[in-house]
Amino acid sequence: MTLIDHRKIVESIVKAIEGEESVQGVFLSGSLIDGNKDQFSDIDLGIASINNEETFEKAYSLRHAIMEAVGKPIDSVERGWENCKMVAVLYGRSQFPPLGLEVDVIFSQLRHVSEQMPYADYEIVFDRSGTLRQALAKLSRRKPKEEVQKEIRLHLAWCPFYVHDALKACERGDSPPFHTLLDEIRKQVFFAAAASRDQQVHGSKRGLKYLSASERLAFESSYHGFNKGTIQKLTDLYVAKLKELEVRYQVGPDVEQLQRTLKELL
């Protein structure tokens, strides 16, 4: 099986847009550079324009040239947020076997590059005058401790509600919401496990890598049960991972409160 040459595709994209003066630079992010690359990796690119609205729109108009530089797309979707615009493009398996390819490109003015993919590793692949390197040098690649602490406490606050609703779904014999609710707790497990190693996860993606072999077995067993014991085992694992964070993130009292609440529910 021929593997996708992600680097060659990135080079084709850069070649297609580097002649446009409004583009100041292009950087690569995501699994291609953070140690998680595999044959199924997406391509995540950030593009920075000159700092004014007109040149930003001109740079964004290059999205069609970018699509064509990669191949013939089978679908695409555009969205935007405060200072950024994004296009996600999908290519079929006939062009990129075995599963196709997704290319995500985010555009912003140079002064807003930190808003494109915050706290992400990056690699500059085109920098017209060195200004992109200067802008990205100010970007933190890790969430501040205070922000992680805030997320942990938010997860702790919601966990009992997920547990309670999962128990009700179990008693009703309603498995779809049961597993949907357990998925929320699974995400919390992954977040805590990654935080214990000073890493971060997005939802459930590649979260298993932060669990030990025995923890992974306990975690994966939660997909096969539909009873109170399944919830108990998953929350036991969650509490165990939280205890690893008590000192660093000062959440000891919060974890103790969660344990008291879970004891009352389970």
Name every feature range the model reports, one short phrase each.
Residues 34-40:
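Short glycine-biased active-site loop of nucleotidyltransferases that positions the nucleotide triphosphate
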Residues 109-127:
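A short alpha->loop->secondary-structure connector
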Residues 142-266:
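Conserved nucleotidyltransferase catalytic core and NTase-mimicking acidic/glycine-rich helix/loop elements
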